[in-house]
Amino acid sequence: MSSETVSYFSHPFPRRQSVGVSVGGVIVGGSAPVVVQSMTNTDTADVDSTVAQVVALHRAGSEIVRITVDRDESAAAVPKIRERLERLGHDVPLVGDFHYIGHKLLADHPACAEALAKYRINPGNVGFKDKKDKQFADIVEMAIRYDKPVRIGVNWGSLDQELLTTLMDRNQAEGAPLSAQDVMREAIVQSALISANLAEEIGLGRDKIILSAKVSQVQDLIAVYTMLAQRSNHALHLGLTEAGMGTKGIVASSAAMGILLQQGIGDTIRISLTPEPGGDRTREVQVAQELLQTMGFRQFVPIVAACPGCGRTTSTVFQELAQTIQEDIRRNMPLWREKYPGVEALSVAVMGCIVNGPGESKHADIGISLPGTGETPSAPVFVDGKKVATLRGPGIAEDFQKMVADYIENRFGLGRKIAS
């Protein structure tokens, strides 16, 4: 195995060097960890609903939240949303998502321009023909005036058609023309880079610019961001647009972003999931955290390992216990982060039979091996690799939950610090 291969799989992974950008105090790029962000789907003019969803997203772990600013009523609501969030103790940076009339909204609502931590600009619809550069410049000048960063967010569904047509015509004149897909990828990259260069010419510093180039296909996303990473040192926002619902959206986003992150590309991510009707918007935050944690980039919540089950595990007790422990951890993490510093590194194992159960449980900080089919109805518990107890009877689940809570208190709690 070559030294280059060893380096590629080492930890930490080699990270592309980008220019760091402060978004309301959250650093994106540079040497900062990859940041998790999300977006509301409420009507921003509805202050109560928007505040409630931002709070839920922030509690779930979103470090930046984007909101739609599409009309006067939405822009007027932004300062109220910001004020309400601060009163509730949620000082999460808000990003204004602007399309078509962002230049006008920012000019007409200075309190909105001030309250937002970042402006998102789409070069494909900021203006058309002779108005495009002027309206783009207006937003950039607002960012300079209020000392705000911008994300220049190209999207293949609203790609600058003039640029695409120019590149298509130029490609046809070549002796060996590229495919239409390759030309589209190049147009997306050029749209982002041309816009970034224009913003810098107007006077916006590179430490105020984040780029994104979103498409809906995995291979396109990998190609486009690889090209951007090679041709720029701007901070990059990763995201697969129109990823879809449920498992499909999770798999597509994880496949694309996992490859890019492994290559050191990406400074902030958003998993754009289509929620089920009545579904939980915070799911996208959880998936983003799990992607980064699974790849070893960050730690957000304790890991609960559980076996998949087989013919030896006809009982559902281990599945129910694993789910209960995971839900309990998620529910308590906002408090635990404050009360138990370092608890994110905890690992818990809930196993279903004797084959791998004891071994897996020993590798976790605290683990339990529940009895499988035909096995003695007892469950050994391991703490820091050593067997410390054997649980029996109908209260195994409740007893183990208490042991987990006691372990967290003893290892991460204030009493441990005083004793040390």
Swiss-Prot record:
> To which protein family does this belong?
Belongs to the IspG family.
Please list the GO terms describing molecular function.
Answer: 4 iron, 4 sulfur cluster binding; 4-hydroxy-3-methylbut-2-en-1-yl diphosphate synthase activity (ferredoxin); 4-hydroxy-3-methylbut-2-enyl-diphosphate synthase activity (flavodoxin); iron ion binding
Name of the protein this chain belongs to: 4-hydroxy-3-methylbut-2-en-1-yl diphosphate synthase (flavodoxin)
Q: Which EC number(s) does the record attach to this protein? A: 1.17.7.3
InterPro entries assigned:
Dihydropteroate_synth-like_sf, IspG_bac, IspG_bac-typ, NO2/SO3_Rdtase_4Fe4S_sf
The biological process GO terms on file are:
isopentenyl diphosphate biosynthetic process, methylerythritol 4-phosphate pathway; terpenoid biosynthetic process
Cofactors: [4Fe-4S] cluster
Which residues does [4Fe-4S] cluster bind?
C307, C310, C353, E360
Give the source's domain of life in one word.
Answer: Bacteria
Source species taxonomy: Bacteria, Pseudomonadati, Pseudomonadota, Alphaproteobacteria, Hyphomicrobiales
The cross-references to Pfam families, in alphabetical order and at most eight, read: GcpE (PF04551)
> Cofactor note, please?
Binds 1 [4Fe-4S] cluster.
Function text: Converts 2C-methyl-D-erythritol 2,4-cyclodiphosphate (ME-2,4cPP) into 1-hydroxy-2-methyl-2-(E)-butenyl 4-diphosphate.
What Gene3D superfamilies does the record point to? Dihydropteroate synthase-like, Sulfite Reductase Hemoprotein, domain 1
Which keywords belong to this entry?
A: 4Fe-4S, Iron, Iron-sulfur, Isoprene biosynthesis, Metal-binding, Oxidoreductase
Q: Which reaction does it catalyse?
A: (2E)-4-hydroxy-3-methylbut-2-enyl diphosphate + oxidized [flavodoxin] + H2O + 2 H(+) = 2-C-methyl-D-erythritol 2,4-cyclic diphosphate + reduced [flavodoxin]
Name the NCBIfam families for this protein: ispG_gcpE, PRK00366.1
The gene designation is: ispG
| UniProt organism field | Brucella suis (strain ATCC 23445 / NCTC 10510)
The first-level EC class reads oxidoreductase
